[in-house]
Amino acid sequence: MIVDAAPSLGGQAVGSIIGTIIGLYTHGPQPYQITHGIADELIADLTQEGSLSRRVSMTGTITFQYDEVRLARWIERKVEEAGIRALVGAVLTGVGFDGRRVRHLELATRFGSARVEARSYVDASGDATLCYQAGLEVREPDAPVYGSLNFIIEGYDTDAVKDLVIKEVHDRLAERGSQYGLVRHDGFLMHFPGKTVMLANVTHFETPLDPAAGAQMVFEGRRQADNIIRFLRAEFPRIFANAKVRTYGNPGLRQTRWIVGARQLTLDQIRSGERPADAAARCAWWVELHNAKELVHWERFEPDHVYYIPLSCMVPREADNIVAAGRCVDADVSALSAIRVMGPCMAMGAAAAHALDLAAGGSVHEIDMTALQNRLTDNLDRRS
């Protein structure tokens, strides 16, 4: 079963319009794919229907821009085809936990309460919600890590946009952005080839774990999106004179709260690229820390540099039947900023499912790592 607090499936990839799939390939003159499985199916299916655009980036890697509406339907179809029951619009209100095991979940929906019992659980909430509600130890950043509200632009000149130079936009944001109520000086504006829409990721705001602040994140993100449109119309009228927002995404959260695992992945470990004995996923994305309003902090690695996520940073040290996947695994702030992107999240999801399957009714801390890595060989060793 999959449980989602949103009224539909897709997480931030759909609801927050992340808009790009990154982290599937290495960086370098000949980048190669390091995460496979469901990623291969997604690329093949969405490419065939024209909903995915392959991009060779200026940083020497391969990323994909996707149509979020078509991705949402693809996810729904895949869930149905796999026979997975989905419970949407379900907010976690309580966790039955004893003897180092989650026994059941208590959920609230607009149609009434629900209770879910399972042998094992994956915390893919992004905010370590399952572990937090179970009373397990969690971590939070010492300083803000900024989120973004992505949005889709339409009405711009699709011929003139070919002349858009993003560095000129960045320079103008640094010079005049404050006059339009803007705080961020970088980000991207990405026209979808063959379509009449553009993805915008150029906002920054704080994302506190405060229930009363949720609406303010939406308001502030949309206010910045509106101000970006004003800025583009005034500063780049040849392209954006008639531009407008077509769709606002939900606030995109990056690093808010994460588990305390059996071990913590560190920046030094991803710099070294040393493969741990319990490697469960392979990564190559650079450090991308949104710790300042104005600019993202990047730390770039050498071409073809890869590093690994150990299973021990995905398993809460106080629980036997939970594996975390995604941006709530245990890593220091810098390391987490590198592994939280979509490619590694897919790899962690696969590792979590296989680890819990091997654990059966026992402890995920005690599984046969050779058996797990044999199942995950495409994501750990394949070079293609």
Q: Language-model segments: what does each one mean?
A:
Residues 1:
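Conserved beta-strand positions in the Rossmann-like core of class I SAM-dependent methyltransferases
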Residues 76, 92-93, 103-106, 119, ...:
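Short, well-ordered alpha-helical packing segments
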Residues 4-94:
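Conserved N-terminal/central alpha/beta ligand/cofactor-binding core
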Residues 95, 107, 151-155:
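Short beta-strand element of the conserved SAM-dependent methyltransferase core
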Residues 12, 89, 113-120, 125-384:
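Flavin (FAD/FMN)-binding glycine-rich loop and adjacent Rossmann-like elements that form
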Residues 96-115:
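Conserved beta-strand-loop-beta-strand element in the redox core of flavoprotein oxidoreductases
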Residues 16-19, 101-103, 154-156:
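Short low-complexity, flexible loop/linker segments enriched in glycine and/or proline
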